[in-house]
Amino acid sequence: MALVPIVVEQTSKGERSYDIYSRLLKERIIFLTGQVEDHMANLIVAQMLFLEAEDPEKDIYLYINSPGGVVTAGLAIYDTMNFIKPDVATLCTGQACSMGAFLLSGGAKGKRFALPNARVMIHQPLGGARGQATDIQIQAQEILKLKEMLTRKMAEHSGQPFEKVAADTERDNFMSAVEAMEYGLIDKVLTHRDIK
């Protein structure tokens, strides 16, 4: 199990200690790190809903460093980002690949960022099926529907034509932060802090 740093704050009532992620949550910062999967998605959704309840007018900051993961788990996060009232600003630190890139591009327009050495990778969804031929056919149809929907949404977020995004996601397509900005997946490369 990884150790999580603890920070201590002085208050009028004495000292209070927080794990670093809880302290950053007070600043409306959520970390999406590692593989996107159901448990992690549920925690991120819960944090977004909590922050909306705390203040529906203030932005939420989603810091992403992820190789991607389960499409349906990522869509739970994506749908919540769009469902809640606060804008969700996204910031790539390290990498945003696959579903990580999709979530990065799905941040509020004008509030999608990456650090200078971040890497972004887009591709079509991955899947595998086993079982009877009919079951494999059902799975294939489902992944094709997901591919079409994800491509359409990424085209919408990037401003690129659907056909271009479809072609560009046929294989792993790696981009620097500047290339991701030129493609329309992010709005700005941050070289110094100018957001909270």
Curated annotation (Swiss-Prot):
Disulphide bridges: none
CDD domains the UniProt entry points to: S14_ClpP_2 (cd07017)
Any Pfam family the entry gives: CLP_protease
CC terms in the record's Gene Ontology section: cytoplasm; endopeptidase Clp complex
A GO molecular-function descriptor: ATP-dependent peptidase activity
Catalysed reaction equations from the record: Hydrolysis of proteins to small peptides in the presence of ATP and magnesium. alpha-casein is the usual test substrate. In the absence of ATP, only oligopeptides shorter than five residues are hydrolyzed (such as succinyl-Leu-Tyr-|-NHMec, and Leu-Tyr-Leu-|-Tyr-Trp, in which cleavage of the -Tyr-|-Leu- and -Tyr-|-Trp bonds also occurs)
Enzyme Commission number(s) of this protein: 3.4.21.92
Presence of the UniProt keyword Hydrolase in the record: yes
Protein's cellular compartments: Cytoplasm
Residue numbers annotated as active site: S98, H123
Keywords: Cytoplasm, Hydrolase, Protease, Serine protease
InterPro entries in the record: ClpP, ClpP/crotonase-like_dom_sf, ClpP/TepA, ClpP_His_AS
Stored PROSITE patterns: CLP_PROTEASE_HIS (PS00382)
GO terms of biological process kind: protein quality control for misfolded or incompletely synthesized proteins
Primary localization class, coarse: cytoplasm
Membrane-spanning intervals of the chain: none
Summary of subunit composition and partner proteins: Fourteen ClpP subunits assemble into 2 heptameric rings which stack back to back to give a disk-like structure with a central cavity, resembling the structure of eukaryotic proteasomes.
Protein family according to the UniProt entry: Belongs to the peptidase S14 family.
Record function comment: Cleaves peptides in various proteins in a process that requires ATP hydrolysis. Has a chymotrypsin-like activity. Plays a major role in the degradation of misfolded proteins.
NCBIfam families, alphabetized: clpP, PRK00277.1, PRK12553.1
PANTHER family: ATP-DEPENDENT CLP PROTEASE PROTEOLYTIC SUBUNIT
Protein known as: ATP-dependent Clp protease proteolytic subunit
